[in-house]
């Protein structure tokens, strides 16, 4: 898509640095990445393009889906085509972000490529409909899915405006978006709820609970605390978390603790300090959980 640079000249560059000129143009591009740098900015968007907004420096604020959301580094916001939202930034120093705009043609090409990959379809069954997918709109952590991890890999090169094969970059972003979308759809289908809108809102809250676990799994995490973060009752949280993710919150905490334990034990930390750091009641309970998970005591794991 043709854009106007700061001097008013047209450009077809796939990565464009923009600031105040964003006030004057509609934000419904196709297959372009906008690197924004703004201090005092507000804009109402009445018809957006399909976009992935990646936080970089500072905080961007949006009024979207009848609520205010904040976007920071380590997060991205997914917005479907033809949506409305408001964006506002007030900061003494520039706030920077990257926005990936993807065309319907690109999404279709990526979906066609995935449909020819039998192995990938076994892991991420594609829907049979030819309709453009409606992606789940929310703030995602970049460490929670394939798309986020790929965006984080791209960030340094984008920030430095390095020369990249942008045709491949756009195709890879679209492919990761679709695989992440299909995984999300699988998880949402597990939730026992008739209405799609209710299921989506429940899934958003469950993702909040899961991220709370990721941020606090080394602490003495209580179910009441987790339910409060997700705005759900304890029993509703327990039931729907297992339906969506195939694991209970307690099992999720234990998995994360033991995964980190393998690294700490391998680095030579004492078993008592590992148990203490990861929130186990004592060395004995840590050793028992480790052996049950990996089939050997942590001391043998270290020796191996």
Language model regions located:
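Terminal helix-turn-helix DNA-binding modules in bacterial transcription factors
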Residues: 207-215, 220-232, 239-282, 287, ...
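Short, Lys/Arg-enriched, Trp-marked, Pro/Gly-tolerant hinge/linker segments that flank
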Residues: 123-145, 152-219, 224-225, 229-230, ...
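Residue-level signal for well-ordered alpha-helical positions
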Residues: 90, 113-114, 180, 264, ...
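A short, N-terminal "cap"/entry segment at the start of jelly-roll beta-barrel domains
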Residues: 1-28, 157
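ATP/adenylate-binding site constellation spanning eukaryotic-like Ser/Thr protein kinases
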Residues: 57, 255-258, 295
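N-terminal regulatory/effector-sensing and dimerization cores
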Residues: 19-127, 158-164
């Amino acid at each position: 898509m043709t854009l106007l640079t700061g001097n008013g000249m047209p450009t077809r560059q796939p990565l464009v640095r923009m600031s105040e000129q964003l006030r004057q143009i509609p934000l419904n591009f196709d297959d372009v990445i906008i690197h924004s740098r703004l201090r005092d900015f507000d804009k109402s968007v009445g018809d957006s393009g399909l976009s992935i907004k990646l936080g970089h420096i500072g905080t961007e604020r949006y009024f979207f889906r009848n609520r205010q959301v904040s976007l920071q580094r380590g997060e991205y916001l997914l917005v479907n085509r033809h949506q409305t939202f408001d964006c506002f930034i007030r900061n003494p120093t520039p706030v920077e972000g990257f926005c990936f705009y993807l065309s319907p043609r690109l999404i279709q090409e990526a979906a066609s490529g995935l449909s020819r990959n039998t192995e990938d379809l076994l892991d991420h069954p594609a829907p049979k409909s030819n309709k453009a997918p409606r992606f789940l709109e929310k703030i995602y952590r970049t460490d929670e899915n394939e798309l986020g991890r790929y965006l984080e890999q791209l960030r340094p090169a984008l920030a430095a405006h390095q020369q990249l094969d942008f045709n491949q970059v756009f195709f890879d972003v679209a492919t990761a978006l679709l695989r992440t979308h299909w995984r999300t759809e699988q998880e949402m289908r597990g939730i026992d709820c008739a209405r799609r809108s209710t299921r989506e809102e429940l899934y958003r809250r469950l993702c909040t609970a899961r991220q709370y676990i990721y941020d606090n799994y080394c602490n003495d995490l209580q179910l009441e605390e987790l339910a409060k973060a997700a705005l759900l009752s304890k029993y509703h949280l327990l039931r729907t978390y297992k339906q969506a993710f195939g694991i209970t919150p307690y099992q999720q905490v234990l998995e994360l603790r033991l995964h980190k334990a393998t690294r700490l034990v391998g680095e030579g930390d004492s078993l008592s300090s590992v148990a203490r750091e990861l929130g186990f009641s004592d060395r004995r309970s840590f050793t028992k959980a480790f052996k049950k998970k990996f089939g050997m005591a942590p001391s043998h794991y270290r020796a191996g």
